[in-house]
Amino acid sequence: MKKRYLFPADYMADPSVHVFNGRVYIYPSHDWECNNVNNDSGDEYIMKDYHVLSTDDPMNGEVVDHGKVLDLQDIPWAGRQLWDCDVAEKDGKYYMYFPMKDKCDIFRIGVAIADRPEG
């Protein structure tokens, strides 16, 4: 089986992957380096934004980082930790569903809407 490392510059994990209009879109979680202690509250995870990656050829082509598409600061009820998201298309709109902790540290599910798969 052929393998390839796609994004060496950042801490990204848990991707959802979709093909929209013949292009592969990757929606990973994005963690930031920190020195927080590992505990049951997940304080060691600083996941404060999402990036979208895409490519025409996952094994040989260039992987484009479309940059930050959603940030904790963009979400009024956000507390911390944007976990693994997923995206669905309906009627030409792209819906990103994401779990995160609110200001009371309770997990909630939110949705963001865009006109393009890259945000």
Predicted features by range, described:
Residues 1-119:
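Carbohydrate-active catalytic/glycan-binding domains of CAZyme proteins
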